[in-house]
Amino acid sequence: MDSPSSVSSYSSSSLSPSFSTSSVNSDFSFPSDNEREGKGTHELRPDTVGQRGGSRPSPGPIRCRHRPRVSSNQHTAPHLEQQGSEVKRSRDGEQETSLNTQGCTTEGDLLFAQKCKELQGFIRPLTDLLNGLKMGRFDRGLSSFQQSVAMDRIQRIVGVLQKPQMGERYLGTLLQVEGMLKTWFPHIAAQKSSSGGSRHQISKHFPSHHGDPGAASPAPLLEKMGQTQLGHLVLKPKQPWHLTGWPAMNLTWIHSTPICNPPLSSQGSASGHSPIGTGASIGVILVLQKGGQPFTHSAPGTPVPPTPLSPVVPGDLKKLPGEEPRCHSLPVTLPSDWSCILCPPVLPTTDREMTKGHPEPQMTSHPPVAPDPQP
């Protein structure tokens, strides 16, 4: 029977290898307590690998290192998808707003754009005034503060006129600016009203010549001669033009192109030929007929010295004995390249000629015939 000392030494020697192996295994091969709770299924694989391979390292810690990356990828993928959907929604919203903005064009916007187009003629004088303020042309009359305020106002007005897409929000301000501009530049406002009315009336019935530079120039005769001077010869702006329905007697019209003379051999009315040409001069023509064939006469090609003109009335023509009624037109300036056919002398236009009863001959295509000498 063994002694107690031998039993204790045997037990210590038999237990020491187990403790040493357990300590080595706990340091290198086994996971921690937290890893045991989460991944209990992988605990047996290191032992089996260690038993079979011996020196092969255990892949336990490596798997633990890759797992957070997989989880992060799983979290980032939905996040990227959410961001992509938000960007797509924002783009769709921008497209919808742009379509709504383009489609919402009200009558006020169109009226604002039309007003800006009508007031384009004031941009040039406003620019000249602004340049004069910058160059010091008004230093004596205005202080520096007044000049700076004036320049700021003029720049704002010009900026509004150059942006017709601003919309009806500023329509009231534009109407106030229009009244102010017409007060500052009355000659430009009058010129726009006269030429605009005549062009609007002509554009309804005659083709427009955009390529002709002369057609764009304002008519000088309408600016100088008013309705009081022309009298009954002036055609009202609202009166419709019916070329085919005009009679041959007492024909009155205002035309903005040179007169096209019909051939003298034609026995019809002179209204069959439309006064459409390439020039832009304006004349007033009165056609009369007394039982016979109508006479035609066009305006002279050279300007006539300014003399007081009196309107030609059919009643005054009867006072002249021995004179046949003719077609008479007021003198205007025609283009240099316009060839016109001139006929025998026309009726007198001044009071002096009417009292004498002998009209002075004007430029004609036939040589003037000298009167027979009285015995």
From Swiss-Prot:
The keyword Cell cycle does not apply. Keywords: Biological rhythms, Nucleus, Repressor, Transcription, Transcription regulation. Induction: Expression in the liver oscillates in a circadian manner with highest levels at Zeitgeber time (ZT) 12 hours (at protein level). Expression in the heart, lung, stomach and kidney oscillate in a circadian manner with highest levels at approximately circadian time (CT) 12 hours. Its expression levels peak at circadian time 12 hours (CT12), 8 hours earlier than the peak of PER1/2 and CRY1/2 transcriptional repressors (peak CT20-CT24). Thus, it can repress the CLOCK-BMAL1 activity in a different time window compared to CRY and PER proteins. It is found in: Nucleus; Nucleus, PML body. One of its GO terms (biological process) is circadian regulation of gene expression. Residues 1-32 have a biased composition (Low complexity). One of its GO terms (cellular component) is PML body. The keyword Transferase does not apply. Its main location: nucleus. One of its GO terms (molecular function) is RNA polymerase II cis-regulatory region sequence-specific DNA binding. Pfam families: Ciart. Disruption phenotype: Mice exhibit a longer circadian period of locomotor activity, alteration in the expression of core clock genes and impairment of the response of the circadian clock to stress. The peaks of DBP, NR1D1 and PER1 gene expression persists longer in the liver between Zeitgeber times (ZT) 12-14 hours. It comes from the Eukaryota. Residues 33-46 have a biased composition (Basic and acidic residues). Residues 1-102, 192-218, 351-375 are annotated as: Disordered. Transcriptional repressor which forms a negative regulatory component of the circadian clock and acts independently of the circadian transcriptional repressors: CRY1, CRY2 and BHLHE41. In a histone deacetylase-dependent manner represses the transcriptional activator activity of the CLOCK-BMAL1 heterodimer. Abrogates the interaction of BMAL1 with the transcriptional coactivator CREBBP and can repress the histone acetyl-transferase activity of the CLOCK-BMAL1 heterodimer, reducing histone acetylation of its target genes. Interacts with BMAL1, PER2, CRY2, BHLHE41, HDAC1 NR3C1. This is Circadian-associated transcriptional repressor.
